[in-house]
Amino acid sequence: MLSEFKRFALRGNVLDLAVGVVIGAAFNQIVNSLVNDVIMPPLGFLVGKMDFSNLYLNLSLTPYASLAEAREAGAPVIAYGLFLNNLLNFLIVAFAVFLLVRQVNRWRPTPPPEPPKTKECPYCLSTVPVKATRCAHCTSDLTAES
């Protein structure tokens, strides 16, 4: 059983997946920092020195000064500012993955085109299989053509 697990764990795609998960976790931290520390502060400044992560809709009748205070009190809230931050995180990650996949696809060699499976009968212009020796439509002999 141990040797079977070793074979499974050392297969190429399992190791690739493990590396991808580790790199993805590190990339997630970079994207979070990019959104929270680089993009959102200037955006908040442009719309009036607003911290997006503290935007929320209070569903209780008691007013609270901040999202943290409302959550600490157990008040029901809709934290749409955090949602906006997470949405921006997702868009950045999705765009980065798109660029990565696009580049990898460019590096892959293009497969050779498949040979045609049909040809045109020179007599009646109908489509017939490439291997046909006689046209099914006009019964012309197609072997002389080859």
UniProtKB/Swiss-Prot annotation:
Gene Ontology CC annotation, any one: plasma membrane
SUPFAM superfamilies, sorted: Gated mechanosensitive channel
InterPro entries: Mechanosensitive_channel_CS, MS_channel, MSC/AndL, MscL_channel
Topology versus the membrane: Multi-pass membrane protein
Segments crossing the lipid bilayer: 14-34, 81-101
Pfam families: MscL
Compartments in which it is found: Cell membrane
Keywords of this entry: Cell membrane, Ion channel, Ion transport, Membrane, Transmembrane, Transmembrane helix, Transport
GO molecular function: mechanosensitive monoatomic ion channel activity
Domain of life: Bacteria
Assembly behavior: Homopentamer.
Family matches, as NCBIfam families: mscL (TIGR00220)
Main function: Channel that opens in response to stretch forces in the membrane lipid bilayer. May participate in the regulation of osmotic pressure changes within the cell.
Family: Belongs to the MscL family.
HAMAP family in the record: MscL
Protein known as: Large-conductance mechanosensitive channel
Gene (UniProt): mscL
